[in-house]
């Protein structure tokens, strides 16, 4: 457990260093491309993110659950190899379907710039699909940090170099875009080489495969695939609908603002990368005492860091956004609402992993489907009226409320947030007294959140001990 905590800390530092690099890149990127071009990239990546579901079809959950159960290294390597072959076959099918419906997509957006670049989705999809498949394979072997560094840090370092070159040589958007895709491809090659070195097997072992085993994987995979699809749609539908209703410029501003709000989400991503494979192993071995300890500790750590970041964004999100340009300051509420939604999500600790890798995995699909319906409905209602603020409200509301206790936690967070706004409105400048006052209130918020999560964890872990088992 200590080793995993160390890996989680390293992964979190990698993530936040990457966020810093990303903010620097975003700041300079606004000097070489317009908000409309940023919106174009966001829409291309959003469409790719939806298509990637059909390519991977639940492989993430399948690999974590079933590779962790295999004892033989040759069997694990064989399982990984078969997953890559299956993924590539699905990729070819998805590309054919995408080409068939390309005209419908272009008709929906009616944008000449998108028409010029839409076919770039094909190589982007291949690169992202292979990278994610390699990443999840390494996670199953508890080797997540290298993939995180490549995905989050190296690509941003190379991107920063590209931006400097673009500023110096005054590169066109087309050359900048092609160069960026080339950086993603280089990153993928490095990761695949690392995967080959770390998961080298002497021979393939297919002895674990049977018709019953295949049916079990297919049954589990279908539910997790649809759950993953719903999750992807939930995370992408806001950008897609903003692009069509508000325009590419609005999508560009929303994309910049959402980067800040999702900083809290990086905490949960680290938990998924590092601890979910362990959750799968502990459930398989029925090691509930270890699950209990992990559940309590992770929940506290997530809220401790998350609440600090949330408070910071409440006060300084507007100032941070104004760095990118006057128009971007309109994304203040996007940052705050998304940060609040992610903070609530962090409070659920490893609930998602426990549900997904237990016999109650169907619950994951049902809840995500309901949340998707809620998200799309609210987007249709709120975006025309409130623009990007309406989109983020719909997205924040649809972030997984895994348990009923979170409703109580949300109420307390909202009460605390109200006090913060009242205080902020009465402090004209941030002098030493104001900073001291904010620091004291921040300390009270931290203590309160930790108390609430401790109470909730005690209640929930008793339920998990009685109900959760591995199948």
Briefly describe each language-model feature range:
Residues 419-471:
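Membrane-proximal transmembrane or re-entrant/amphipathic helices at the cytosolic face
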Residues 43, 119, 150-165, 169-198, ...:
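Hydrophobic alpha-helical transmembrane segments
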Residues 102-121, 313-343:
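Interfacial segments at transmembrane-helix termini and the short loops linking adjacent helices
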Residues 27, 56-71, 140, 200, ...:
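Helix-loop junctions and terminal segments of transmembrane helices
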Residues 1-4, 169, 173-179, 191-235, ...:
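Interhelical loop/hinge segments that connect adjacent transmembrane helices in multipass membrane
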